[in-house]
Regions:
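Conserved eukaryotic protein kinase-like
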Residues: 2-336
Length: 336
């Protein structure tokens, strides 16, 4: 089947319209073959862009419905994409990528002035929303570990298997599905920037100068991102997850979270800076080890571990926490 015929057949099955969510029975997400969509088709998917799901550095995200499945449609600002021809080529490459910790890219729109990406819809928002208490719940320590392990596995796959950078690792780009499985978003935009000709393609990316608290000093000195830059960003996200503190707070002794944590750890206050909403309901050894991992990721570039190492060590943290939970269950059973 040609792409055009496949596209027509695909769109003949659309369940899109002006109906309210309550009138639509959504089906569990399954992989939809990727295609190129026209702007008119994207307009239909999003019901004329009437439901804004969120806003990010690349553009506005809208909710839509495609074949009884919810999808997220990111309308991109063309100014944010360095090379449209290269971008289109890479989108074709990325629609083939399937990893449980990466948001699935369904397709794209490149129609006149309109540029968009279509993704699977992820139900539980992003990590930033969850940590902020927006939904009224507090993530347990075990759940936080599982989430950050998912992020680490997604980055490990990007670095080791695809040999590309993510470049935008931050809580707003870590989405959580109905089971709170972490899925990295926006990785498909990582290669739409010029690469350094002196390195392997995609292993080093030039980024316009600017201040971003998730990027390391190496970037600020050179404006080039490397795998260690992603690892630094990951470490900062981990520190946020552990402490539930903002990345930058000018009222702190040291405004940036990495420096602030270093100061507190030097004082011996490791557990004192853990998110108080956890109410000390965690295995201390697991938290301390996780803090060490986060700090090593945020250390100087040549001292940072690989994501493969991080995955191994984080699973050890999870094993420690699970052992505590099992032990506590045993104690309750004996008491009864």
């Amino acid at each position: 089947m040609t792409e055009a015929k496949g596209l027509r057949r695909f769109f003949s099955k659309f369940i899109c319209g002006d109906a309210d969510d309550s009138t639509i029975e959504y089906e569990p997400y399954v992989y939809i073959p990727a295609n190129s969509y026209s702007y008119a088709e994207v307009t239909k998917i999003t019901t004329k862009f009437n439901r804004v799901h969120g806003k990010g550095g690349f553009g506005v995200v809208y909710r839509g419905v495609l074949n009884k499945q919810q999808v997220a449609v990111k309308m991109l600002n063309r100014a944010s994409v360095y090379n449209i021809v290269q971008f289109t080529k890479e989108v074709h490459d990325f629609v083939k990528v399937r990893h449980k910790n990466l948001v699935s890219l369904i397709g794209y729109c490149d129609d006149g002035e309109h540029l968009a990406l279509l993704y699977e819809f992820v139900a539980n928002g992003d990590l930033n929303d969850q940590l902020s208490g927006k939904f009224g719940n507090v993530l347990s320590w075990e759940r936080r570990l599982k989430i950050i392990i998912g992020v680490a596995q997604g980055l490990e796959y990007l670095h080791s298997e695809l040999r590309i950078l993510h470049r935008y690792v931050k809580p707003t780009n870590i989405l959580l599905d109905e089971n709170f499985e972490a899925k990295l978003a926006d990785f498909g935009l990582s290669r739409s920037s010029p690469t350094n000709p002196d390195t392997e393609a995609s292993n080093k990316i030039y980024v316009k100068p600017g201040r971003d608290p998730y990027l390391d000093d190496q970037y600020f000195n050179s404006n080039w991102l490397t795998q260690t830059s992603d690892i630094y960003s990951f470490g900062i996200v981990m520190l946020e997850m552990i402490t539930n503190q903002p990345v930058v707070d000018n009222n702190r002794e040291s405004p940036h979270i990495s420096k602030w944590v270093d100061l507190q750890v030097a004082k011996g206050d490791t557990l004192e800076i853990v998110d108080p909403r956890l109410n000390n309901d965690f295995e201390p050894t697991s938290v301390r080890k996780a803090m060490d991992i986060a700090c090593s990721c945020a250390a100087r570039a040549h001292n940072r571990p690989s994501m493969s190492q991080v995955v191994i060590e984080l699973n050890e943290c999870l094993a420690l926490e699970k052992a505590r939970s099992i032990g506590r269950t045993g104690e309750i059973t004996q008491t009864q």
